[in-house]
Amino acid sequence: MVVGDVTTGTELLVIGGGPGGYVAAIRGAQLGLDTTLVERDAYGGTCLNHGCIPSKALISASDVAHDARQAESMGVFADPAVDMAGMTEWKDGVVTRLTRGVESLCKNAGVNLVEGTAEFVDDGTVRVAHGGEGQGSESLSFEHAIVATGSRPMAVPGFEFDGEHILSSKDALALESVPEKLLVVGAGYIGMELSTVFAKLGAEVTVVEMLDDVLPGYEDDIATVVRDRAEELGIDFNFGEAADNWEETDEGIRVQTVDEDEVVTEYNAEKCLVAVGREPVTDTLALDNIDLQTDENGVIPTDDQCRTAFESVFAVGDVAGEPMLAHKAMAEGEVAARAAAGEPAAFDHQAIPAAVFTDPEIATVGMTESEAEAAGFEPVIGQMPVRANGRALTVNEKEGFVRVVADADEEFLLGAQIVGPEASELIAELGLGIEMGARLEDIAGTIHTHPTLSEAVHEAAAAARGEAVHTR
């Protein structure tokens, strides 16, 4: 690469080194394309550095502390002390190891790595600004470009993130002490995961949510299981309230919310975590220079090959819209790289799993019963309660269920919903089933190891056929 006015070229340019971007870059290089990856921060993106990995590390650590306190029924007695600074240091070590791993994978694949912020000059050129003022820039021409710039936490008007009083999820994951009182605005998956973490670590947690329940978009019986467990942890929920304003106090902050009747409620807390969703990051790309439009949510529209309105420009991951999931971004990155290399490729949305790492976990894939009906199917349902699974009881778990949705006529698997221990691991079998066109008999006819949680998947499929043995 030459710094200055000279333009150098690459066949495949990837902007953003998160899950979608680094996978696209590695696959492009493996397919023989001269590939360049531009990243302005840390390799691995939000997922690895400020999202999926660090949050799950803290979830695991908080589970250890909580489980130790709850082990008396198993004849184990302990009173663990929490060192949040030490926990954060351990979490950061995990992140550093994986970030270095991603960089190493890219280098080993032959990907050219460039640090900086890329913006489009035209539909065949970007300018990359390196670091801060005086660090210089360079121009890169490309045959194909893949935009994978990810997303960032959305702020509530008047509640801009300051890292001290008003926290984003990124800020919350970097805390070195447990807040005595934590107010969480938003009861979606991020708000619920982090509320659970800090409640288990000893914080007094209050959640306010505009809607009438936790986890908007999930079925009521799933949300109920998670909300009930959260309330057992001491989390206080207040629904139908919107954050309105806040002020600093001697003890921390005072937040006012307002409901639809204009009733104002005040909450005192040490810190306020705002978790109301995420928005695509496109403002650094100078999309106006190539007249590439985004929709009203800032999403770059794409086709089933992840191509934008420009044949040479692709978009993958969060900038390409919901669901904003790392594994969806990776799959799209694969598709875009193959399409750029001239290989046949298309992205299929029907079997994208999703997981929420609450207590208990939630995992879903494919259609719900109502979605199947709306799609014209006559669905049949099979459900297995967690409390009827022997292995679940041996790990002191009893709440939740495994549910499968199938077509009543042909018994093709259409979807699944799990709430319970290790749901995020169990869902893979059912995602594979949907992907390969499996029928209920394929799941029910497969011998599952005993005693394991996976037997609940087997039993749910059998229940849908009227052949359940271990549940009524």
UniProtKB/Swiss-Prot annotation:
Homodimer. FAD binds at residues 39-47, 56, 118, 318, 326. Its main location: cytoplasm. The active site is a redox-active disulfide bond. Belongs to the class-I pyridine nucleotide-disulfide oxidoreductase family. The keyword GTP-binding does not apply. It catalyses: N(6)-[(R)-dihydrolipoyl]-L-lysyl-[protein] + NAD(+) = N(6)-[(R)-lipoyl]-L-lysyl-[protein] + NADH + H(+). It comes from the Archaea. GO terms for molecular function: dihydrolipoyl dehydrogenase (NADH) activity; flavin adenine dinucleotide binding. Signal peptide: none annotated. It is an enzyme of class 1 (oxidoreductase). This is Dihydrolipoyl dehydrogenase 2. NAD(+) binds at residues 186-190, 209, 275-278. One of its GO terms (cellular component) is cytoplasm. The active site is at 450 (proton acceptor). Disulfide bonds join 47-52. GO terms for biological process: 2-oxoglutarate metabolic process. InterPro entries: Class-I_Pyr_Nuc-Dis_Oxidored (IPR050151), FAD/NAD-bd_sf (IPR036188), FAD/NAD-binding_dom (IPR023753), FAD/NAD-linked_Rdtase_dimer_sf (IPR016156), Lipoamide_DH (IPR006258), Pyr_nuc-diS_OxRdtase (IPR001100), Pyr_nucl-diS_OxRdtase_dimer (IPR004099), Pyr_OxRdtase_I_AS (IPR012999). Its cofactor is FAD. NCBIfam families: lipoamide_DH.
